[in-house]
């Protein structure tokens, strides 16, 4: 199938699409996008479950490390006041992990923004497509009503005025038949009229979900940022109660990070399957929801020379009918105006109606061409399969970095907490500790003595 203009599946789409998939029985599952298929749903759930496995391994590692730290720690010599050496190394490792987490937060904000931009582009494309479809329906309705009004009023009046000339009455009735035929042909061009599926409603639903997704990620990013900052503050002030609280919060955020990573991974894999061949799924789904013929849908979704315009015959017949009406009105104006002055007014009104109808017809021809709607289709795919997918990958990187940083922090904080001096004995803190308050006090005293 022909790709929409400007859209080509990216390298990330190909890479994620080629990853193996399996159901709960570990049987291979095809990578074609089939969200209603139970085996495909199980494959995506299994991808999300890998994050749960990562969370379990992280918790086991942290538990084993802390148990070893508590049970295998050598006893302190009697009367020892200074903490064991290496406190600075423990503190610096915790600081490094927190700085990595802060870098991941920046990546997360960028990914969240990219995903939001992609969804916004999808929503804008759907709204523009809805505007095009609504304009087609409105133009067809107005044109058909205008021709019907001309048949009921001007042509009827003209027949009454020209009743004395049989050949002129015949020409008038011929124009009536052509107007009715043109209206009938034009009425079949409103292919979206009466369809329950509304692109603007889909756009509103997508925007509604995206707003809550964006807000949820902003809150998660801010929560991770606050945990990192307050943990650094607790290390700087050597506040035991703050470190204990941040340890509990780090455990909570660790669970949230792995959970968000599972959702992101499953969504990215499913989105890559859709983006590798979107035409087939979108065409089948649209035909199922709207009941529109496959010829029309193929014309707009593919828009290439291999697919003919399904409206070409109706457009040709309508154009011929309008040209015939125009020719007959010109003949009536030449023959009837000198002999029947009363025919001048309906003829002028008919001529004006015909000119407006021809302008609307040419506008319809432009709107019915596949270029406009196919361009919207390509824009929607680029927003979803390029910006949104790229944003999801950055969010996955954020989740991975924050999970690793928080796991390291959870291993380091209890050791750092154990190295904190009692509140009444700050003079015995480790000289290697970068947050040693006595070192800061000595530095201030040295400056004042200069």
UniProtKB/Swiss-Prot annotation:
Task: State which residue ranges cross the membrane.
Answer: 44-64, 89-109, 215-235, 241-261, 391-411
Q: Which GO terms describe its cellular component?
A: chloride channel complex; filopodium membrane; filopodium tip; membrane; plasma membrane; smooth endoplasmic reticulum membrane; synapse
Cytoplasmic topological intervals: 65-88, 236-240, 412-450
Q: How does the protein associate with the membrane?
A: Multi-pass membrane protein
Q: Which domain of life is it from?
A: Eukaryota
Q: Which residues carry this modification: Phosphoserine?
A: 440
Its recorded reaction(s) are: chloride(in) = chloride(out); L-glutamate(out) = L-glutamate(in)
Bridged cysteine pairs (disulfide):
275-385, 303-370
Query: Subcellular location, in the record's words?
Result: Cell membrane
InterPro entries attached to this UniProt entry: Tweety
Q: Where is this site: Essential for the formation of the channel-pore?
A: 165
Molecular function in Gene Ontology? calcium ion binding; intracellularly calcium-gated chloride channel activity; volume-sensitive chloride channel activity
Q: Name one GO biological process term.
A: cell morphogenesis
RNA-binding found in the keyword field? no
**What keywords were assigned to this record?**
Cell adhesion, Cell membrane, Chloride, Chloride channel, Disulfide bond, Glycoprotein, Ion channel, Ion transport, Membrane, Phosphoprotein, Transmembrane, Transmembrane helix, Transport
Q: How is it modified after translation?
A: N-glycosylated. Contains high-mannose, hybrid and complex oligosaccharides.
Stretch list, region Disordered = 428-450
Glycosylation sites noted in the Swiss-Prot or TrEMBL record: 130, 284, 355
Query: Which residue intervals are topologically Extracellular?
Result: 1-43, 110-214, 262-390
Similarity annotation: Belongs to the tweety family.
> What biological function has been recorded for the protein in this entry?
Calcium-independent, swelling-dependent volume-regulated anion channel (VRAC-swell) which plays a pivotal role in the process of regulatory volume decrease (RVD) in the brain through the efflux of anions like chloride and organic osmolytes like glutamate.
Tell me the subunit arrangement: Homotetramer; disulfide-linked. Homodimer.
What is the protein name given in its UniProt record?
Answer: Protein tweety homolog 1
**Origin organism of this chain?**
Rattus norvegicus (Rat)
């Amino acid at each position: 199938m022909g790709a929409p203009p400007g859209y080509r599946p990216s390298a990330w789409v190909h890479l994620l699409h080629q990853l193996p998939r399996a159901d709960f029985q570990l049987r291979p599952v095809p990578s074609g996008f089939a969200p209603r298929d139970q085996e495909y749903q199980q494959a995506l759930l299994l991808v999300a479950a890998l994050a749960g496995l990562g969370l379990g391994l992280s918790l086991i590692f942290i538990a084993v490390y802390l148990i070893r730290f508590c049970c295998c720690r050598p006893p302190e010599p009697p009367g020892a006041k200074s903490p064991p050496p290496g406190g600075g190394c423990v503190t610096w490792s915790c600081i490094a992990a927190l700085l990595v987490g802060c870098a991941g937060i920046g990546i997360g904000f960028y990914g969240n923004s990219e995903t939001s931009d992609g969804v916004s582009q999808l929503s804008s494309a759907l709204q523009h497509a809805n505007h095009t479809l609504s304009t087609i329906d409105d133009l067809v309705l107005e044109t058909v009503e205008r021709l019907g009004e001309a048949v009921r009023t001007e042509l009827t009046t003209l027949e009454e005025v020209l009743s004395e000339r049989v050949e002129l009455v015949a020409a008038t009735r011929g124009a009536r038949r052509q107007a009715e035929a043109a209206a009938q042909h034009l009425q079949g061009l409103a292919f979206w009229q009466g369809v329950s599926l509304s692109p603007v409603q889909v756009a509103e639903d997508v925007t509604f979900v995206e707003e809550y997704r964006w807000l949820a990620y902003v809150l998660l990013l801010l929560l991770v940022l606050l945990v990192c900052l307050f943990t650094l503050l607790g290390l700087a002030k050597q506040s035991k109660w703050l470190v204990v609280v941040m340890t509990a919060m780090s455990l909570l955020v660790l669970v949230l990070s792995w959970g968000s990573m599972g959702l992101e991974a499953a969504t990215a894999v499913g989105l890559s399957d859709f983006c590798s061949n979107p035409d087939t799924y979108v065409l089948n789904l649209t035909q199922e929801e709207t009941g529109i013929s496959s010829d029309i849908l193929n014309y707009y979704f593919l828009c290439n020379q291999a697919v003919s315009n399904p409206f070409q015959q109706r457009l040709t017949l309508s154009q011929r009918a309008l040209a015939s009406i125009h020719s007959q009105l010109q003949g009536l104006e030449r023959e009837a105006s000198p002999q029947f002055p009363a025919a001048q007014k309906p003829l002028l009104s008919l001529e004006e109606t015909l000119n407006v109808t021809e302008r609307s017809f040419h506008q319809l021809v432009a709107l019915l061409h596949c270029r406009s709607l196919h361009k919207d289709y390509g824009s929607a795919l680029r927003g979803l399969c390029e910006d949104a997918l790229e944003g999801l990958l950055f969010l996955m990187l954020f989740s991975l970095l924050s999970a690793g940083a928080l796991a390291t922090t959870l291993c380091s904080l209890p050791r750092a907490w154990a190295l904190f001096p009692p509140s009444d004995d700050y003079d015995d803190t480790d000289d290697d500790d970068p947050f040693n308050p006595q070192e800061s006090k000595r530095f201030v005293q040295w400056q004042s003595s200069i």
